[in-house]
């Protein structure tokens, strides 16, 4: 194989993570706690002069126990926590009320001989320094705990708010809260306290946020309204509202929640997306409803009326449509020719296994979405294996910025990390373009990504005969590179490159020109036995023969 490539490498920058709570933990000398064990079914923890936290030891393979802060109120909520039975994988902080003289925790379903009773600690702080060698360098991750879908993305007063599905009590799915991070440039994130906590209505599932500029809901002009799904066996999946008067730091739940229930009692009814429809001066909500999307409208942001549905029989029909979004964009930059893109996240059953993001292009008249394509046409927003739950920021003007979850439900709970699980893909700007008389949705990393570049190095052109070995480039690389390659195929049918280390681990990325495929083979990249699909990932390409030169 002979190729003539030109390579430019730009060193990535380590993101600065500002932590808004403690950095270390230590055993308190002022506070005490006692255990009142009532068999294996109930243990009551009595704490005198409580610290900020009680640190709970976690064993990921242990059964869940129910932990409740007992204040005597009807709103007291059980959290499902995998307390250590025979070993401690890590600790998580359980916040205790400020200024309380005594605190009571009720812990159910944990045997008296469990290791956790010996390992529980009281502390005023909690160590969030990174301990995981597999944490991404420049992607947003939670400081600790589990994260999946991005939620409530909204821009206000110079800040991008990234809320997300979050379990603060372990690095596996559960106890859904809305975690919260903010950024001024979409690259460097400040971690804040969780914004919306699980309550007696259920888990806080995915949703969206808007800025109520005109005080339509009555909570003050400029307040942030969050719409989310409360999910529980008792109440099913219902849509709820919370509002913030302090720039999204804290939220108050609407006293008349829920604002919307499924009229037909549908089990899978979640992930509300709310957006402004200017031609009729109204708000529109999309809710995923089994294998379709349902549309509603409102003029007061509290009472919602059914409009229509879309999706039955369209595109890939998996177990469930999830995390909808819909944006209007100019086609090929022409502001006089606009189309709507309906984003639908689907799981499982996707072309490349597990979960992914498809979309539909069409028209929306304020009541119905009409797709341009036939039902059997499927369009994927991204062909990567780790791309799901893509949703867009609101209140960004003409700019449409989306953030995906960088994982896959095939293996997300068992990736080889402990302190945290999951990351967000880079924010990307969306657009519409035409190809072969059809319209497609494009997604490119936001321009702010270039600000991560530091030192760069150009490699002079060279000819490859079978292979060409570059020993080392940018050795002080802080764990990340950007590679830009210009490859002339010549007579080669397969061309690409390998990234490898001295442990024998490698990733192969190459073009198979006869089959028109881009292949990423990460089956030898290190720990790979946790996934259900460890075969090379192949992407079918659309290009002419001239484009391959």
Language-model region placement:
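Conserved small/polar residues in nucleotide/adenosyl-binding loops
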Residues: 543-548
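Glycine-aromatic-enriched beta-strand/loop faces of beta-sandwich-type recognition domains
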Residues: 254-259, 503-542
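Bacterial N-terminal signal peptides that target proteins for export
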Residues: 2-13
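Bacterial Sec-dependent signal peptides at the C-terminal "C-region" and cleavage site
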Residues: 21-32
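Bacterial N-terminal signal peptides
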Residues: 13-22
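Beta-rich carbohydrate-recognition and catalytic domains
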Residues: 30-271, 276-321, 328-383, 405-462, ...
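Solvent-exposed, conformationally flexible loop/turn segments
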Residues: 51, 462-468, 478
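Secretory/extracellular carbohydrate-interaction modules
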Residues: 468-522
């Amino acid at each position: 194989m002979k190729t003539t490539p030109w390579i430019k490498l730009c060193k990535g920058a380590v993101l600065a993570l500002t932590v808004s709570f403690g950095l270390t933990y230590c055993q308190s000398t002022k506070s005490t706690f006692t255990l009142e064990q009532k068999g294996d079914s109930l243990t009551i923890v009595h704490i005198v002069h409580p610290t900020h936290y009680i640190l709970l030891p976690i064993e990921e393979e242990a059964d869940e126990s129910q932990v409740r802060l007992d204040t005597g109120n009807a709103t007291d909520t059980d959290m499902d926590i995998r307390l250590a039975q025979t070993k401690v994988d890590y600790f998580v902080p359980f916040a205790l009320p400020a200024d309380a003289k005594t605190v009571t925790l009720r812990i159910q379903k944990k045997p008296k001989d469990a290791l956790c009773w010996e390992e529980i600690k009281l502390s005023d702080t909690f160590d969030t320094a990174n301990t995981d060698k597999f944490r991404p360098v420049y992607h947003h991750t939670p400081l600790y705990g589990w994260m999946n879908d991005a939620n409530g993305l909204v821009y206000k007063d110079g800040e991008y708010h990234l809320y997300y599905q979050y379990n603060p009590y372990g690095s596996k799915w559960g106890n859904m809260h809305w975690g919260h991070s903010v950024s001024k440039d979409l690259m460097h994130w400040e971690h804040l306290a969780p914004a919306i906590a699980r309550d007696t209505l259920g888990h806080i599932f995915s949703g969206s946020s808007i800025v109520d500029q005109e005080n339509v809901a009555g909570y003050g002009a400029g307040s942030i309204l969050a719409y989310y799904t409360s999910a529980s066996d008792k109440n099913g999946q219902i849509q709820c509202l919370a509002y913030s008067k302090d720039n999204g730091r804290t939220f108050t739940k609407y006293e008349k929640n829920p604002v919307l229930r499924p009229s037909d009692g549908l089990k899978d009814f979640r992930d509300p997306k709310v957006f402004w429809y200017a031609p009729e001066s109204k708000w529109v909500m999309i809710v995923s409803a089994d294998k379709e999307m349902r549309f509603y409208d409102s003029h007061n942001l509290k009472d919602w009326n059914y409009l229509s549905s879309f999706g039955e029989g369209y595109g890939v029909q998996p177990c469930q449509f999830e995390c909808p979004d819909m944006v209007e964009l100019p086609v090929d930059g022409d502001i006089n020719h606009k189309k709507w893109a309906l984003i639908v996240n689907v799981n499982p059953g996707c072309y490349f296994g597990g979960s992914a993001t498809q979309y539909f292009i069409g028209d929306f008249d304020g009541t119905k979405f009409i797709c341009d394509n036939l039902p059997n046409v499927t369009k994927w927003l991204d062909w990567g294996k780790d791309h799901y739950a893509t949703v867009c920021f609101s209140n960004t003007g003409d700019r449409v910025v989306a953030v995906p979850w960088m994982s896959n439900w095939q293996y997300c709970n068992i990736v080889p990390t402990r302190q945290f699980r999951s990351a967000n893909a880079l924010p990307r700007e969306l657009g519409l373009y035409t190809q072969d008389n059809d319209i497609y949705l494009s997604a490119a990393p936001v321009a702010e990504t270039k600000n991560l570049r530091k030192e760069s190095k150009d490699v002079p052109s060279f000819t490859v005969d079978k292979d060409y070995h570059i020993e080392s480039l940018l050795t002080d690389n802080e764990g990340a590179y950007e590679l830009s390659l210009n490859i002339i195929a010549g007579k080669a049918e397969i061309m690409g490159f390998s990234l490898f280390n001295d442990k024998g681990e490698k990733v192969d990325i190459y073009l198979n020109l006869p089959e028109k495929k881009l292949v990423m083979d990460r089956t030898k990249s290190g720990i790979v036995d946790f996934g259900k699909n460890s075969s090379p990932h192949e992407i079918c390409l659309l290009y002419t023969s001239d484009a391959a030169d």
